[in-house]
From Swiss-Prot:
GO terms for cellular component: plasma membrane. Residues 53-67, 112-286 are cytoplasmic. Residues 1-30, 89-90 are periplasmic. It is a multi-pass membrane protein. Mechanosensitive channel that participates in the regulation of osmotic pressure changes within the cell, opening in response to stretch forces in the membrane lipid bilayer, without the need for other proteins. Contributes to normal resistance to hypoosmotic shock. Forms an ion channel of 1.0 nanosiemens conductance with a slight preference for anions. The channel is sensitive to voltage; as the membrane is depolarized, less tension is required to open the channel and vice versa. The channel is characterized by short bursts of activity that last for a few seconds. Keywords: Cell inner membrane, Cell membrane, Ion channel, Ion transport, Membrane, Transmembrane, Transmembrane helix, Transport. It comes from the Bacteria. Homoheptamer. This is Small-conductance mechanosensitive channel. Pfam families: MS_channel_1st, MS_channel_1st_1, MS_channel_2nd, MS_channel_3rd. Gene3D superfamilies: 1.10.287.1260, 2.30.30.60, 3.30.70.100. NCBIfam families: PRK10334.1.
Length: 286
């Protein structure tokens, strides 16, 4: 009895297949086509991702940023590939895209700040206002760029503090790059007493500048009276030097200016206050 039931089931299934062979053949063709689309799409996504990584590394971009951008491109291609495969199987892709769009909008509103940092990170990668190893001022935060990531940038300060700055804040503010140009101007203000001779002061300061071989004299040297302040004559000294020598030149000039002014008996004023005491005498009436 059981054997007859099995035979009847097989015959019934065979009959159904014969009656619906055209429909099944169409589904089989669509299924094979969808699989082929997925395979080809995956190969294309992998090839483009690999090529993009090679090109971005050749431009010297940060490895983390390179792999992140390559992954984003790969996933975007895979998403379009999956939608195309579903469309081949007869799925209404319009509704799928609508659902994904609504979900993307909801996620975008929830992660508005993070997406802003992401967009800013992409702009920093594309326009390269600074690179790893350069000294920059990012909205009042000064340090050496350690790493440029897709959501934030890491700086190391001179006293070895690590500061993480959101990329959105960087794009919204001013970016000052101290390392991009090979040369940099050093500005120093020197205050002397009012009784000092202007020409003598300029000569003394000029001799100190001329003795420093690190200064790029061909780029120009400026030594002028800049301000007649409340208690001093302020001279401005402007010289040019290589970027790597900036602070060494600055500190050495400051020390040598003090020695030279002392050697020539030129006073350096400092803030002072005169206090006058008056003794009140109370008159006595006789």
């Amino acid at each position: 009895m059981k054997e007859l039931d099995v035979v009847d089931g097989i015959q019934s299934a065979g009959g159904w297949i014969v009656r619906n062979q055209d429909l099944l053949l169409g589904y089989a063709v669509n299924l094979v086509a969808a699989v082929v689309i997925l395979i080809i799409g995956s190969l294309i996504a992998r090839g483009i991702s690999t090529t993009l990584i090679r090109l971005l590394k050749a431009r010297g971009l940060d490895v983390t940023v390179v792999h992140f951008l390559a992954a984003m491109v790969r996933y975007a291609i895979l998403a379009f590939t999956i939608i195309a495969a579903l469309g081949r199987l007869g799925v209404q892709t319009t509704s799928v895209i609508a659902v994904l769009g609504a979900a993307g909008l909801a996620v975008g509103l929830a992660l508005q700040g993070s997406l802003s940092n992401f967009a800013a990170g992409v702009l920093l990668v594309l326009f390269r206002p600074f690179r790893a190893g350069e000294v920059v001022d990012l909205g009042g935060v000064t340090g050496t760029v350690r790493e440029v990531q897709i959501f934030s940038t890491t700086l190391a300060t001179a006293d070895n503090k690590v500061i993480v700055v959101p990329n959105g804040k960087i794009i919204a503010g001013n970016i000052i790059n101290f390392s991009r140009e090979p040369k940099r101007r050093i500005d120093i203000i020197v205050g002397v007493a009012y009784d000092a001779d202007i020409d003598v002061v300029k000569r003394v300061l000029g001799d100190v500048v001329a003795a420093d071989t690190r200064i790029l004299h061909d780029d120009g040297v400026t030594i002028r009276l800049n301000e007649m302040a409340a208690s001093s004559l302020n001279f401005v000294v402007r010289v040019w030097g290589n970027n790597a020598d900036y602070w060494a030149i600055y500190f050495d000039l400051m020390e040598n200016f003090k020695r030279a002014l002392d050697a020539n008996n030129i006073g350096i004023p400092f803030p002072q206050m005169d206090v006058h005491l008056y003794q009140a005498v109370k008159a006595r009436a006789e």
